Amino acid sequence: MAASGFLLIASFMLVLLVLARPLGSFLARLIEGDPFMPLQKIEAGLWRCSGVKNVEMNGWQYALAILLFNILGIALLFALLMMQGALPLNPENMPGMSWHLALNTAVSFVTNTNWQAYSGENTLSYLSQMAGLTVQNFLSAATGIAVAFALIRAFSRHSAATLGNAWVDLVRITLYVLLPIALIIALIFVSQGVLQNLDGYLHITTLEGVKQTLPMGPVASQEAIKMLGTNGGGFFGANSAHPFENPTAFSNFVQMLAIFLIPCALCFAFGQVVGDTRQGHALIWAMSLIFVVAVVVVMYAELAGNPHLIKLGADSNINMEGKESRFGILATSMYAVVTTAASCGAVNAMHDSFTALGGMVPMWLMQIGEVVFGGVGSGLYGMLLFVLLTVFIAGLMIGRTPEYLGKKIDVFDMKMTALAILVTPAVVLLGTALALCTDAGRAGILNPGAHGFSEVLYALSSAANNNGSAFAGLSVNTPFYNLLLAAAMFLGRFGVILPVLAIASSLVAKKRQPAGNGTLPTSGPLFIGLLVGTVLLVGALTFIPALALGPVAEHLQVWLTH
């Protein structure tokens, strides 16, 4: 079993790196503004129709464009979800959502969180799935990548005032990257048996004589961008555990690759654009080290399972509860780590049924900011925030002004870095405290004790870090949780994006200093170790007290009573 686990990890990383390197080179061309000749005429037509001028923006113009674009997206999606009962492509006559669920869902999909307090097959029309959620899956992914593009340009340019054009970046990312790759992935999914139709639901009689309804729908097209854009919102309530979304072991492997593909490619692109490929390789090494250890820990925890099962007459104590037998323990454990290391949130098993230790690792990966490859765009700029913090700490230790890639890191940069790193932990911990201190919050807890606390902590961690997965034992489709989690998702998304763009605006104006004898090398093993240590230390200091009350306490309860 151990050999199979390591073979799965090794094969996944090998295929990922082989695919990500050429994509990284293409992304580097987009960042540097190289024209893509076959689509230049389409671009020009889009600029004319939309009235967009292809001129560069400064940091605040870029931030304002991104913010207004996403707020408009929330408003339009909210209206669509409220009115879906009166709109076409609704063969099952689904009514409009309640206002608080519609608001939660709109904020969720626009912020790339895809938190779902509903089951899609029982709640949404095909129009809402296609024109609402799928469109935002593309646009929210493009938003994250565009912010990463702006930050990369800030490091590669010097003595400049602009970061690119937000509208141009959004269009090019969608047209040149997301749409073509999503089309290829969708065709792979269809070949594996994922649904893609606009038929009404099938009403059948099983061999046992029981009536059953089989949901239909355009699943593959949404599933592709759901994974590629690290969105994670399922067409069905069971998400990628549903055989109509993820039918085979091969489709499961492709889904994991799709989640990490763009985040890994952006690291390669970063190294190429700044003129030192070793910088991108260092980020990949740091991310990979944390990722591999996390996968091994979850595999071990789920294979160790629950020692009380043998006493109760089970054949084995391995934890297969909530898992699909077509995937097994190893692939399920790895999927859980992939989806929470990235800001995806898709699940092929029920995380609420994991062991205490197996469930704690995905929760912790979200809590450290999802910087282990992370979401499309957000993973890279999140890790670069930790790079700046690491450089600052190293500068304090040797008594030098911190610098990274020849750019001096000043007080303003560190204030914005600290703000971006601390905003999501603050939202998570304050939101959890609010939920536990109010009757409305406690009413949603179905499992009392340490696990109930873990469910609330997981929900806020998932929302604030724009992940979207859940410990599903928490009843969240209430006005209290819909509004609380909507606020957490919005603050977690734009409370990081705005400081990141402020940092980019500051860095792009600075001169690049030549490396000297006292310059800290940022591409070697020493810096990689220091970076990993900084990520772990910040995560430990922030969340260990909360984790001790939840999954750690639950783990001790299980094993100390054995």
UniProtKB/Swiss-Prot annotation:
InterPro entries: KdpA. Belongs to the KdpA family. This is Potassium-transporting ATPase potassium-binding subunit. GO terms for cellular component: plasma membrane. HAMAP family: KdpA. The chain crosses the membrane at residues 6-26, 63-83, 132-152, 175-195, 253-273, 283-303, 327-347, 356-376, 379-399, 416-436, 483-503, 526-546. Keywords: Cell inner membrane, Cell membrane, Ion transport, Membrane, Potassium, Potassium transport, Transmembrane, Transmembrane helix, Transport. It is a multi-pass membrane protein. It comes from the Bacteria. It is found in: Cell inner membrane. Coiled coil: none annotated. Part of the high-affinity ATP-driven potassium transport (or Kdp) system, which catalyzes the hydrolysis of ATP coupled with the electrogenic transport of potassium into the cytoplasm. This subunit binds the periplasmic potassium ions and delivers the ions to the membrane domain of KdpB through an intramembrane tunnel. GO terms for molecular function: P-type potassium transmembrane transporter activity; potassium ion binding. Pfam families: KdpA (PF03814). The keyword Cell membrane applies. The system is composed of three essential subunits: KdpA, KdpB and KdpC.
